[in-house]
Amino acid sequence: MKPSLVLKMGQQLTMTPQLQQAIRLLQLSTLDLQQEIQEALESNPMLERQEDGDDFDNSDPLADGAEQAASAPQESPLQESATPSVESLDDDQWSERIPSELPVDTAWEDIYQTSASSLPSNDDDEWDFTARTSSGESLHSHLLWQVNLAPMSDTDRMIAVTIIDSINNDGYLEESLEEILAAIDPELDVELDEVEVVLRRIQQLEPAGIGARNLRECLLLQLRQLPSTTPWLNEALRLVSDYLDLLGGRDYSQLMRRMKLKEDELRQVIELIQCLHPRPGSQIESSEAEYIVPDVIVRKDNERWLVELNQEAMPRLRVNATYAGMVRRADSSADNTFMRNQLQEARWFIKSLQSRNETLMKVATQIVEHQRGFLDYGEEAMKPLVLHDIAEAVGMHESTISRVTTQKYMHTPRGIFELKYFFSSHVSTAEGGECSSTAIRAIIKKLVAAENAKKPLSDSKIAGLLEAQGIQVARRTVAKYRESLGIAPSSERKRLV
C-alpha cells in the first residue's frame, strides 16, 4: 500500500473561542460571573461599567441591547433577537453570530468584607467567647489563645499544644494519651500522668466539652460546668453516666424504671441534656457563610406572575466610546492592532452577556409558566417537570437548559430556589394522572409534622396514607423521600410528650 495525498470534502463543527466564551459564561453562577466581569474590566480598556446617572452617549449598540435584555419583566417567552450576518470584517462589524441557544446574564457590585478579632476589654461585664470567633477563627487557634493566657510551665505548654493538635474540628480528642505522649520530645522526660493532668486543664477551656474522648465524656464535661443549682443536674449526670445507651435507643420506660422517675420528671432531665452540644467544636469551627444572589425575580401583579432579571445583580457594560474612536482603519501598527483586538473582545463579551440574559429569561419564564400551582399554593401543587419539557418549549438543547439552571436562583414570594429545584420526576396516581416527587415529599413532611409523637408514622403507614390520597408509592420510595428530607425513622422520632 503506497502513501498518497487525497482531497476530501466534508463538514465539521468548529467551536470558536467566542462560542467557548458564551458557553462558559452561561454556566457561571452570579458570583462567579461577577468575578469574570471584574477581570474583563481590569484587562480590557475598551470595556467599562455604566453607572447609574451616566448621561453621555454610548455609541455601541451591543451595550444598549445588553441593558434592554436586563430590563422589562416578561409574561411570556422572549422572541429570538435578530443578529446581523457578517459579510465583511469592517471596523464596525467585529462580532460574529452566536447560536440562539447560547446565552447571557448578570452580576453585582463588589463586596469587600473586613473582619477583626479583639480581646475582651476591661469594661466588659460579661464576655461571650463566640464573639471573638465570629470572624472565622479556627478551633485550634482559639484554644491556643486560651492556653497562652493560662499560667503554666513551658513543659505543660508543650504538652497542651500537642493535645490541641490532636483535637478535631468537632472538639473531640482523636488520639490516645499514649500516642500523644509518643509525639512529645523524649528529652522533656514527660510521664503519662502529666499528659492526663494537662488534658484535664484543656477540658476546662471554652467551649465546654472540648477535648473529650467520646460523647459520654463530652456531655459530662458540659454538665459539670453548669451551676450546682441547676434543676435536675444530678439526675442528668447519672443518666449520661449510666444510661446513655437507653436514651439513645429512646427506651423511656426502662429509664423511668431504673432512675425511679416519673414521665414528667424524665422529660425535664432529657430537656436539660438536649441543651448540651454533642459537637462543641462546631461552635468555633463554623464555615464562612455562603451568599446567594437571585438571578431572577418573580412577582405577582394583578393575578399575573411576572418574571424579570435581578437589576441589582445585572452588569451594565458598554464599550468606551472614546477609546473605540481611537481605532484607525488601515493602520497595522502594534498599538492600533491591540486596540482593535480589544474592541472585538469587548463587543463579543457584551454580546455573550446579552445572550446569557436572554436564555435565562426564556427558561425562567417557561418554568414559571409550568409551576404556577407551586407559586399559588405551595409545594404540594408542584407539577412534574424535566429538562426535555423546557428544552422543547424554548427550542434549545437539554444540555443548554442544564447549564442555565445550575447555580442560578429564582426569588419568589415563597423563598429563593435554585432553578433545578423546579424539576422533578413523576409518580403515577390512581386516576391515571401524574404527581411530582417534590409534591410527594411535601405531603410526607406534612404527615410527619402532624403525627402523634408517642406513635410516629412508619414508612408503611405513610405509604398507606398516600395511597388513600390516590398516590401509589412503595414503602422503599417513601423511605428514600423521608431520608432526603432529613427525617429520622419512626423508631428515632418517638419521644416523650
Curated annotation (Swiss-Prot):
The keyword Transcription regulation belongs to this UniProt entry's keyword annotation: yes
InterPro entries according to UniProt: RNA_pol_sigma_54, RNA_pol_sigma_54_core-bd, RNA_pol_sigma_54_DNA-bd, RpoN_core-bd_sf
GO cellular component: DNA-directed RNA polymerase complex; protein-DNA complex
Residue runs in coiled coils: none
Composition bias type Polar residues, residue spans: 71-86
Record region (Disordered): 42-100
Motif (RPON box): 474-482
Biological process (GO), any one: regulation of DNA-templated transcription
Record's keyword annotation contains Transcription regulation: yes
Cited Pfam families: Sigma54_AID, Sigma54_CBD, Sigma54_DBD
GO molecular function ontology, one term from the record: DNA-binding transcription activator activity
Keyword tags: DNA-binding, DNA-directed RNA polymerase, Nucleotidyltransferase, Sigma factor, Transcription, Transcription regulation, Transferase
Name used for this protein in its record: RNA polymerase sigma-54 factor
Ranges of the DNA-binding region feature: 386-405
Record note on disruption phenotype: Deletion mutants result in reduced production of pyocyanine, motility, and proteolytic activity. The motility defect is due to the inability of these mutants to synthesize flagellin. Significantly decreased porin oprE expression under aerobic conditions. Mutants also show defect in biofilm formation.
Cited function: Sigma factors are initiation factors that promote the attachment of RNA polymerase to specific initiation sites and are then released. Plays a role in the regulation of many virulence factors, motility, quorum sensing, mucoidy, a general mechanism for maintaining lytic phage in populations of bacteria, and biofilm formation. Positively controls the T6 secretion system by directly binding to the promoter regions of hcpA and hcpB genes, leading to their expression. Thereby, allows to colonize several hosts efficiently including mammals, insects, nematodes and plants.
Entry's family note: Belongs to the sigma-54 factor family.
UniProt source species: Pseudomonas aeruginosa (strain ATCC 15692 / DSM 22644 / CIP 104116 / JCM 14847 / LMG 12228 / 1C / PRS 101 / PAO1)
